[in-house]
């Protein structure tokens, strides 16, 4: 019996070994047992079944870093580049909050949230009062023909989305037309072990959180999904920020849903980290998928190299504050390489990203957030922005943050890019489409499709004056290593200054074209009315105080007069008593004398 068991064990082990070797040796960078691996997708996100809508023209003004040592001092006009993109109508990415709520309440960590809902409300009313969602980030998984999206779901006991008890990250999948696939599952290979796993959606990401009914702003915020090329398949990493266990520090984390939900916290000893860490911009080097890189900050421009195993980060590149990008740049989408392999200089890479600007006291509102286009370049261990555009709004009337529903009716105008979902060349003619997810007014998650971005970049040109050795075009950007230290940095600083000046001009124009002048007139009219009202209130207050004072003085005088009268009466009576006593004394004397 023991011999038969040993034989059985040996046979099983041999079979497993054969399977393992078959997996390893059948992997040819294109598939494993017919399951395609990243970079060799058999599916397009934009096949004939996909409806993208009618594309409209979108003019984009950009500014290009100039690299010529002998070029004159250049103005923004010399560095400008004007081109045309095509953009689709926006498509709001909806979700079934009833289904999501049920999944969340099934989770042990969040089951007690049900006790904080208003008991007398119906299920629909509970969802409307307590549950909110915004800020979704996604990537297209060509191996599975779906969009993988992670959104922030907010629970508020008091019914205010901006005062949540906790936030929860929920992963969803959508078909190519952005229809949510509820109750569906994916069979995925663990990107590191090759083991088959089953994932049901929507899926509450299992991230430890410490909350109670009296807590505020707990849980995970600002999800960013970036696709890593794992050994056995795609590895969508979800980056987010949350409070640490002591609830005093907010740090950046990554969870890998396809790799047994492995979670790491990023940290560094190279400089003092802030109390709140957020807005790191992730990207991968094409030849290094085992670590993740971040643009930690734009001012100073600081690039980190971080371990995906333990979260330890080192500074790879840093510019001093004087040469950093503007502090008005606040984060960006995860950066993506160009959509097709093209000849490029050795030790050089290029990424596209959409940073966002935060401009205060401009045009339509007190604060305006808008995307801009950025071409980010690595040459060896040097990093810089080759191109920055002005503000981009995709031709949208941005949802007002608050107010009466008009574009200029609230204190904030918020359009924030979340992620580049996909970018691919769709045909033999070289036409390309990029899908970008974004949020408006912290209320919604939508997607737009941009056609012709690769063409826009490929036709790029810059300063071509007589001092230039040759034209500063896209081919030169790709083929040459032209980072030359201070000169490039100074030009790069000029470029971002031009782009931000253009963004401020856009902001002002946005207000003018959307009734900002009338709004300001009405605001001034309201200010004068309010000022008049306050003056009238002040006048009435002074009159009332004067009247009160006069009444008090009159009353005091009357009381003093009354007191004086009373004293006189008392003195009179006292005198009369004294006279009476004297009279009585005299009478006593007379009686004794007799």
From Swiss-Prot:
Please give the InterPro entries that the UniProt record associates with this protein. BMT1
Which UniProt keywords are given for this protein, alphabetically ordered?
A: Cell wall biogenesis/degradation, Coiled coil, Glycoprotein, Glycosyltransferase, Membrane, Signal-anchor, Transferase, Transmembrane, Transmembrane helix
Q: Which residues lie on this side of the membrane: Extracellular?
A: 28-594
Report the transmembrane regions from the record: 7-27
Give the top-rank taxon of the lineage listed in the UniProt record for this protein.
Eukaryota
Q: Where's it mainly located?
A: membrane
Give the EC number(s) listed in the UniProt record.
2.4.1.-
Per the record, its GO cellular-component terms are: membrane
Q: Does the keyword Transcription regulation apply?
A: no
Q: Which GO terms describe its biological process?
A: cell wall organization
Q: What happens when the gene is disrupted?
A: Decreases alpha-mannosidase resistant glycans.
Q: What class of enzyme is it?
A: transferase
This chain is glycosylated at: 305
**How does this protein lie in the membrane?**
Single-pass type II membrane protein
Coiled-coil blocks? 512-594
Cellular compartment(s): Membrane
- Write out the ranges of the annotated region (Disordered): 517-564
List the GO molecular function terms: mannosyltransferase activity
- Key word DNA repair present: no
| Positions with biased composition (Basic and acidic residues) | 517-558
Cytoplasmic side of membrane: 1-6
Q: What Pfam families has UniProt attached to this entry?
A: BMT
Q: What does this protein do?
A: Beta-mannosyltransferase involved in cell wall biosynthesis.
Q: Which family does it belong to?
A: Belongs to the BMT family.
Q: What is this protein called?
A: Beta-mannosyltransferase 3
